[in-house]
Amino acid sequence: MSNVIIFTGTHFTPALAVIEEIKKKEPWEIYYLGRKYTLEGEKIPSPESQILPKMGVKFIPIPAGRLQRRFTRWTIPSLLRVPFGFFKALKVILEIKPKVIVSFGGYVGVPVVIAGFLRRVPILIHEQTATVGLANKISVRFAQKIAISFPESKTFFPEGKVVFTGNPLRPEIFKS
């Protein structure tokens, strides 16, 4: 059986940098469990749903609900989608049997991380910002390692789980 890795989350650019590097160096079968559309209520395809299939990465949309801090017209429909996202993620994890899950934060990553934890799949979370978002605050309980971009972020996470990696960058950023 091949090595299977799942990427997830809504911080797509750093995830893409890691995916591109893995594709160059390792023979992993890569899946991305992400959002189908950019915003709730709009039918604009997400960048990950458009870019990754062209790279040979298997994109699977997860109908996860956003955990909102304010009540809006999307709050109730979004909360109702939370269990659907979890069960879809669990189904995918049971089918493809990943060796590891890498989450780049955001609401879509939470059900994938929890489902992976329940199936005893090792979880790595990457936090791109100096302060921790709600999704990573939830997901950190289920992760074995947390990669951080800023040293000051380590105060938000349990000791022994944190690895300072910086923010993954794509080589194109250095080209003029």
Locate predicted features.
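An aromatic- and histidine-rich active-site surface loop
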Residues: F12-L16, E40-E42, P47, I101-R119
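Short hydrophobic segments within beta-strands
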Residues: I6-T8, L33-R35, S103, H126, ...
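Histidine-anchored nucleotide/phosphate-binding helix
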Residues: P14-K24
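Active-site-proximal region of nucleotide-activated glycan assembly enzymes
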Residues: S2, E29, F117-S176
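Nucleotide-activated donor-dependent transferases that construct or modify glycoconjugates
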Residues: M1-H11, A15
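Conserved nucleotide-sugar phosphate-binding/catalytic loop shared by glycosyltransferases and other
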Residues: F7, E21, W28-R81
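Glycosyltransferases and closely related glycan-assembly transferases
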Residues: K24, F87-I101, G109-L124, K137-F142
